[in-house]
Curated annotation (Swiss-Prot):
Immune suppressive molecule that inhibits antigen-specific T-cell activation by acting as a major ligand of LAG3. Responsible for LAG3 T-cell inhibitory function. Binds LAG3 independently from MHC class II (MHC-II). Secreted by, and promotes growth of, hepatocytes. This is Fibrinogen-like protein 1. It comes from Homo sapiens (Human). Residues 23-61 form a coiled coil. Residues 74-306 form the Fibrinogen C-terminal domain. The keyword Transmembrane does not apply. SMART domains: FBG (SM00186). Under normal conditions, liver-specific. It is found in: Secreted. Keywords: Adaptive immunity, Coiled coil, Disulfide bond, Immunity, Secreted, Signal.
Length: 312
């Protein structure tokens, strides 16, 4: 009887040992499977991010060569008042988009600079002299230029500037570069352009930056009365609203907010750096390079004063 009992104990012990071993193996297998699941979940999340990026890029019908289908098509999701709204809706790729400011009767194309903090609506660009900026009132009112190429030159249009800057308070940032690979910027709070009845009058607020305050003419008190562009009306060769006995726009071959005549003219004639001419009609920012140096590139862009980027 004792032998039988011993045999049963041994058999039971062996059986329990095998079951414990099997349970341990099962636990290890479960841990291995959980680790694999976590790894797969991580990979799925990474793929989801990549898919989202690809889908957004897939929406882009943007050809650097200048095809007419260069506007990033966001479909009929919503209408955007400016580029800051597009940026905060998750579109972080710079390029041409359609916007419709609140008072604008129709949408129009504009280049959105999604770098430099994002959400910048580009209102003017000079890059290579390929576009003629010596134009009349209607052209400057409606806008003109290359709205298809990434670095194309254009003026967004005074009507559009008015529609944009009346919907809220905007900051104007001007990026400048010379032919010696140097760059500067000027920034103005509360940039606003009046309506047609007020001849698209310019209003600017507080300055900050590295290029000097050429728009307000604050570089010397004795010249501010004729050099400042603050509250100046827009002028073109065929619509003269400056404070000069002649016609600044005609002499300087561009449309601008001339006084008598300027300490800044970013729509001037494109020269390669230092130049000589009958008048100081180059692309001028006096407080950086004076009147007789024409800049290589200019970007004028605006964004709401209270813009807070959506990082998601």
């Amino acid at each position: 009887m004792a032998k039988v009992f011993s045999f049963i104990l041994v058999t039971t012990a062996l059986t329990m040992g095998r079951e414990i071993s099997a349970l341990e193996d099962c636990a290890q297998e479960q841990m291995r499977l959980r680790a694999q699941v976590r790894l797969l979940e991580t990979r799925v999340k990474q793929q989801q991010v990549k898919i989202k990026q690809l889908l957004q890029e897939n929406e882009v019908q943007f050809l650097d060569k200048g095809d007419e289908n260069t506007v990033i098509d966001l479909g009929s999701k919503r209408q955007y008042a400016d580029c800051s709204e597009i940026f905060n809706d998750g579109y972080k790729l710079s390029g041409f988009y359609k916007i419709k400011p609140l008072q604008s009767p129709a949408e129009f194309s504009v280049y959105c600079d999604m770098s430099d903090g994002g959400g910048w609506t580009v209102i003017q660009r000079r890059s290579d002299g390929s576009e003629n900026f010596n134009r009349g009132w209607k052209d400057y009112e409606n806008g003109f230029g290359n709205f298809v190429q990434k670095h194309g030159e254009y003026w967004l249009g005074n009507k559009n500037l008015h529609f944009l800057t009346t919907q809220e308070d905007y900051t104007l940032k001007i990026d400048l570069a010379d032919f010696e690979k140097n760059s500067r910027y000027a920034q103005y709070k509360n940039f606003k352009v009046g309506d047609e009845k007020n001849f698209y009058e310019l209003n600017i607020g507080e300055y900050s930056g590295t290029a000097g305050d050429s728009l307000a003419g604050n570089f010397h008190p004795e010249v501010q009365w004729w050099a400042s562009h603050q509250r100046m009306k827009f002028s073109t060769w065929d619509r003269d609203h400056d404070n000069y006995e002649g016609n600044c726009a005609e002499e300087d071959q561009s449309g601008w907010w001339f006084n008598r005549c300027h300490s800044a003219n970013l729509n001037g004639v494109y020269y390669s750096g230092p130049y000589t001419a009958k008048t100081d009609n180059g692309i001028v920012w006096y407080t950086w390079h004076g009147w007789w140096y024409s800049l290589k590139s200019v970007v004028m862009k605006i964004r709401p004063n209270d813009f807070i980027p959506n990082v998601i």
